[in-house]
Design a protein with these regions (language model features):
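Single conserved hydrophobic/aromatic residue that forms the stacking wall/gate
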Residues: 154-164
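Active-site cavity-forming subdomains of large catalytic enzyme subunits
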Residues: 1-124, 128-129, 142
Length: 164
C-alpha cells in the first residue's frame, strides 16, 4: 500500500475464536514439547491440535498478527475497531462491507497512504503497541512500513514513546 501510494485500506482477516475446550495455541506448543519428549503419542498431539485450533483466524494472543492489526488501525490504514474482530463474525462481515464504502471515499477524495502514514501516525501506532504489550516484531514492521512511505522513523522513536 505504501509503496504504490494509491488509495487503499487494510482489511484484517480477524482472530481465531477461543476453543470450547479451554485450550489454545500455547497448549499445542506445550503438547509438541511433550510429544518430542515422548510423554504423549502422535494421536494425542493431533487431538490437542484439533480441539485447540478449531477454525480460521490468526493466533488469539497479542502476537505479531494481532499486534500489527492494532498498529495499522492506530496508523489510520484500517477501519476503527477492525483489529479486534473474530475472523468468523458478523462484525468482520460488516467490516468488509464498510471497507468498500471507505475505499470509494478514499478514491473520490484521492486520499493516499502518504496522506495518512505520517510520522505522527507512526508514533501513535507505536504508542498503541506499547499500551497493548504487543509483539516486539512490531518495531521491525513499523520501521519497514515507514521506510516504504519515505517517513524517517528510527528505533529510538519507539524508545522515546515509552519514556516517562
Amino acid at each position: 500500500m505504501a509503496r504504490l501510494n494509491r488509495p487503499s485500506i487494510f482489511i484484517y482477516g480477524g482472530s481465531i475464536k477461543p476453543s470450547k475446550e479451554n485450550t489454545d495455541y500455547v497448549t499445542v506448543s506445550e503438547k509438541v514439547g511433550e510429544f518430542s519428549k515422548g510423554s504423549i503419542n502422535e494421536n494425542e498431539l493431533i487431538h490437542y491440535e484439533k480441539i485447540s485450533v478449531e477454525g480460521p483466524g490468526s493466533c488469539g494472543g497479542m502476537y505479531t498478527a494481532n499486534t500489527m492489526a492494532s498498529a495499522i488501525e492506530a496508523l489510520g490504514m484500517s477501519l476503527p475497531g477492525s483489529s479486534s474482530q473474530d475472523a468468523i463474525s458478523d462484525s468482520k462481515n460488516n467490516d468488509c462491507k464498510n471497507a468498500g464504502v471507505a475505499i470509494m471515499n478514499l478514491l473520490d477524495k484521492d486520499i493516499k497512504p502518504s496522506d495518512i502514514m505520517t510520522k505522527e501516525a507512526f508514533e501513535n501506532a507505536i504508542t498503541v503497541v506499547i499500551a497493548l504489550g504487543g509483539s516486539t516484531n512490531a518495531v521491525l514492521h513499523l520501521l519497514a512500513m515507514a521506510h516504504s512511505i519515505g517517513c524517517l522513523l528510527y528505533t529510538s522513536d519507539a524508545a522515546d514513546e515509552c519514556s516517562c
